[in-house]
Each structure stands twice: as structure tokens, then as C-alpha cells.
Regions:
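Short helix-to-coil transition segments within interhelical loops
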Residues: 90-94
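Hydrophobic alpha-helical transmembrane segments of membrane proteins
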Residues: 1-85, 95-256
Length: 256
């Protein structure tokens, strides 16, 4: 286990520059579109959560979430290890440890990106509030009370899903994190035509995860509706087979 985390830390170190650049682009585009909307005359009093929703930043976040995982996985490729003289074949550890280290790297990058979004959202709150206060002063001749930061975080459509409020929600989020990291690590590991079935399996697992998030507040439906339990079981079996196939690719020297 210690070797796996050591290798994951090395992977993260190789990926840090590309990840920082990617997160910088994400922060810049989000600040640009949200501040632009907050500067419009009709935006007075709407609040940061409303601007976040109207500019579809939840979809931008999902896109950059995927790019974060791909960038973290790309750091493990042989081309990035050339300077140290290591390749997938010569790295110490078993094939399972190598794939697990890649999955841990991806999961860590995804967690840091989620935390970065929360921090950046807090940073954006203050200039957006100032702009809206200026608009209200122009319209009404006085600054009306604005929603505080806590209210804007609670009202945000992304944080309503990412910040767990119940134990079941925390378990679901951790399960989705582990599943996404494992599937994306496998997708990044296999080469050639093997990527197609892994990609298709990843799409199915993503569809199942979105469905689980949608019924998270009504988990009793899993017992009342057998189709939900069947989909979850199918996704779990598919994930296990995909991980096995990726480990087999590393063992046979077919990894990227």
C-alpha cells in the first residue's frame, strides 16, 4: 500500500504543471462569464448562485473534471517518465499496484479540483456582490441587503450535490469518485481498439452514477425498483472486468 501511494505521489508531481494550467483556464473562464453577467444592469440582486446556474458552469465544471482526470492519467505515460529512465515495464511494483497508483492519482486530482472550485467560488462572491450592490445603488438609491456567502453556497446547484449533508450522500460520492478514478485509469492505460469497449463501459457507469445522484434522497427506491439495483450491479461488474483488463494490459506490456 505504501508503494502504491509513493508511486501515486510521483505521478501527481509529474502532472502538477498541466493540472495547474488547466485549473487556471477553468478559473479564468468562470470569472469572465460570471462577472460579465453580474455587470449587466438587470443582474442586480440575483446573486452568485443564479449567475453560476445561468452561465451553465456546472457543465463547464464537469468538462474540466474529465479533463483533470485525463491530464492526471497522461502524466503516467512512458513519455513523461523518459527523463528518469523508467517505463511501465521497469517501474517497481506489480501491475495491480501500478494501475492502483494511477487511479489514486486521478482521484486525488479530482478531489483537489472540487476543492478548488469551492475556493474560487468564495473568491468570486465578493466582486459579484460588490457589482450587484453598485447596481442596486444606481437603481434604488440605496444598497439593499444581499444574500450572504453561506446562502449562495447552499443555493448553488453544484455544491448541493458535492457537499454531503447525509451519510448516504457521502457514501455515494466516495463510490462515484472511486468508480470514476478506476474507469478513467483503465481508459488511460489500454491502447488501440481496447479503448472503445472501456470508453463504452465508462459511459454506462457514468449514466448509472447520474441516476444514483438523482434518486439519492429516495434510496428506498432501490428496493422498490429492481431496475436500479440491476444497473448498479451491472456497473460494478463492468468496472471489475475493466480493471482486470487494464491490469492484464500492463502485465502483457500493452499499456500506454
Amino acid at each position: 500500500m505504501q508503494h502504491t501511494f509513493t508511486l501515486a505521489a510521483w505521478n501527481f508531481r509529474l502532472a502538477r504543471r498541466s493540472l495547474l494550467a488547466l485549473w487556471g483556464v477553468f478559473a479564468a473562464q468562470q470569472a469572465a462569464v460570471i462577472l460579465w453577467r453580474a455587470a449587466q444592469p438587470g443582474a442586480a440582486g440575483l446573486g452568485l448562485a443564479s449567475h453560476y446556474y445561468a452561465t451553465m458552469q456546472i457543465f463547464a465544471w464537469l468538462g474540466f473534471y474529465l479533463l483533470t482526470a485525463l491530464a492526471a492519467g497522461a502524466a503516467t505515460h512512458n513519455s513523461r517518465r523518459a527523463r528518469s529512465g523508467y517505463t511501465w515495464a521497469t517501474l517497481p511494483g506489480t501491475p495491480g499496484q501500478k494501475l492502483a497508483a494511477k487511479a489514486v492519482t486521478i482521484a486525488a486530482a479530482e478531489l483537489v479540483f472540487a476543492a478548488w472550485q469551492l475556493v474560487w467560488y468564495i473568491v468570486e462572491f465578493y466582486p459579484v456582490t460588490a457589482l450587484e450592490g453598485w447596481h442596486r445603488r444606481q437603481l434604488y438609491g440605496a444598497v439593499l441587503p444581499a444574500a450572504n456567502l453561506y446562502e449562495q453556497v447552499v443555493a448553488n446547484n453544484l455544491f448541493a450535490r458535492l457537499l454531503p449533508r447525509r451519510p448516504a450522500q457521502l457514501v455515494i460520492l466516495l463510490g462515484i469518485l472511486a468508480l470514476s478514478a478506476a474507469m478513467l485509469a483503465a481508459l488511460d492505460t489500454v491502447r488501440g481498439w481496447r479503448k472503445l469497449p472501456v470508453f463504452a463501459g465508462g459511459l454506462f457507469c457514468a449514466w448509472v452514477c447520474f441516476g444514483i445522484v438523482g434518486i439519492e434522497q429516495h434510496l428506498e427506491w432501490l428496493l422498490d425498483e429492481p431496475r436500479y439495483a440491476f444497473r448498479i450491479a451491472a456497473a460494478a461488474v463492468l468496472a471489475v472486468l475493466t480493471v482486470w483488463w487494464a491490469v492484464r494490459s500492463i502485465r502483457r506490456g500493452e499499456a500506454a
